[in-house]
Design a protein with these regions (language model features):
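Conserved serine DD-peptidase/penicillin-binding transpeptidase domain
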Residues: 29, 34, 73-342, 456-457
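Bacterial N-terminal signal peptides
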Residues: 9-18
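Boundary at the C-terminal end of the N-terminal hydrophobic targeting segment
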Residues: 23-25
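Short active-site loop at a secondary-structure junction
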Residues: 53-70, 74, 78
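Bacterial N-terminal signal peptides that target proteins for export
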Residues: 1-10
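Small-residue-rich helix-loop
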Residues: 57, 298, 308-459
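A short, well-structured edge-of-sheet supersecondary motif
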Residues: 27-55, 268
Length: 459
């Protein structure tokens, strides 16, 4: 198949734009003018544009494109994450199979599920059987290994939702909502869901002027958090918890107590999922399509990392201890199978939070082209944010003719801005990938203008 046009720039704006024949001078000129503007002259861009009918390159959250594409390659579009609830000799057992969306704030309302529905359903299943006493409660997250964060993730941000821990048993995006309310003479801090799992040290001061500013800081004691700052009326934020499997177990235990179901023994984490005596009461499924969507449309980090570990677990004897190193090696093999040279990528996580990730823009376009040509293209396409319509592109490309015609994934880290995806032009689908590194000025407008130029000038 014929390459219509392609461009690669990694320059400080002095760069000469190189094109493979035939020379697409109009687009080259427009992009060059954008990059030569006073605002962008000191910034570094990496850009790769190809016709979607032909061949082949990026980091930050654009890494999620690689993870989701590889997940479709290895797991398939019909793959389902699940969580099982079972009985075993009088004990209640909950087994996680890496579902990142159990209790997810966006997916649950879509299915008409109220907050905490899974615990209410488990209680209902027990009461339907007339069970009022349990010997023990066990939670099993061994579908994934015990490494819950990447060493390269910033230590001072591990309390943020976008650095949440990863487990075989996840709940509520592995976060808790902290709500702060000014009651006049004092400030009250509430947790949602309410639980004893997290201990709050309230250091928030009430104020009658200015804006509220509150934050949560971890301490050396797991899940003991200092909430500090000033609060004028009400303020809230998401806080990543430590040890998601234990978090789910405690929430379940507390709900059982509230419902009058007595636990005579202990609450513990235990490997039980291959025990043939398990009597399954409930299975809660989540299709991979929803996980891909939360990863790509909304940039949910937990979703992307669970895909990486699921790739590992499903390709391990015994389907156990899915891990980052193995999952990332398999993703690397997928890239090499597309003809991407090994020196053009280095993978350190699935979400792009790690600053050790290295991808050329041509690597990203190779992956995007592979998905475009695959049988599961509609699944991958629907996972992407749509310009002017939804996801992280909701506020961009709202005007015609771009609205609804740009699909892609944004990326942001300190010093990195990126956007990669597809432009559905009148002449056909075009694949693009844009990366800026360590810009000295804002590059948002320039990136959007480049995408518009790609759309306008496509053959």
């Amino acid at each position: 198949m014929r390459r219509r046009w392609a461009q690669m720039m990694t320059v400080a704006v002095l760069a000469v734009v190189c094109w493979t024949p035939p020379l697409h001078a109009s687009l080259a000129g427009r992009i060059e003018r954008i990059l030569q503007s006073t605002a962008q002259r000191e910034n570094r861009f990496g850009i790769h544009v190809v016709d979607a009918e032909t061949t082949p390159r990026i980091p930050a959250s654009n890494m999620k494109l690689i993870a989701t594409a590889a997940a479709l390659h290895y797991l398939g579009p019909d793959y389902t994450f699940k969580t099982e609830v079972a009985l075993l000799d009088g004990a209640l057992v909950v087994i996680g199979y890496g579902d990142p969306l159990l209790g997810d704030e966006r997916i649950d309302p879509r299915h008409g599920r109220a907050p905490g529905w899974v615990f209410d359903d488990i209680v209902g299943a027990l009461k339907d059987r007339g069970i009022t006493t349990l010997s023990d409660v066990f939670v099993d997250g061994t579908f994934f290994d015990r490494q819950r964060v990447r060493p390269s993730w910033p230590p001072d941000q591990l309390n943020r939702w976008y650095c949440a821990e990863i487990s075989g048993l996840n709940y509520n995006d592995n976060c808790i909502r902290v709500e702060v309310h000014n009651k006049g003479s004092a400030v009250v801090v509430n947790l949602d869901p309410p639980t004893r799992y997290v201990t709050v040290v309230n250091q928030v001061k009430p104020t009658s002027r200015g804006a509220s500013a509150v934050e949560g800081l971890r301490t050396s004691e797991p899940n003991r958090v200092i909430v500090r700052g000033v609060c004028r009326k009400s303020e809230g934020f998401w806080l990543a918890i430590e040890d998601p499997t234990a978090f789910f177990g405690v929430l379940l235990y507390e709900r059982l107590q509230a419902a009058g179901i007595r636990v005579e023994g202990k609450l513990a984490e235990k490997y039980l999922r291959h025990d043939k005596r398990l009597e399954v009461l409930r299975t809660y499924p989540t299709p991979i399509r929803e996980v891909l969507e939360r990863s790509n449309k909304n940039s949910l980090q937990v979703a992307a990392e669970c895909l990486v570990k699921a790739i590992s677990a499903e390709n391990t004897v015994g389907r156990i201890n899915g891990e980052w190193p193995h999952g990332l090696r398999l993703i690397g093999r997928y890239l090499e199978g597309l003809g991407v040279p090994a020196e053009e990528f280095h993978l350190d996580d699935g979400c792009g939070m790690s600053r050790l990730n290295r991808l050329s823009p041509a690597t990203v376009t190779a992956v995007l082209l592979d998905r475009y040509r695959s049988e599961d293209w509609p699944v991958f396409r629907d996972s992407l944010a749509v310009g002017g319509v939804d996801g992280t592109l909701d506020g961009y490309f709202r005007e015609e003719p771009y609205k609804g015609r740009i699909r892609g994934k944004t990326g942001y880290l300190d010093g990195v801005r990126s956007l990669s995806g597809y432009a559905e032009t009148p002449g056909g689908m075009v694949v693009f990938s844009i990366l800026t590194e360590y810009p000295r000025t804002s590059t948002y407008a320039a990136i959007r203008d480049i995408v518009k130029a790609i759309f306008d000038e496509a053959p």
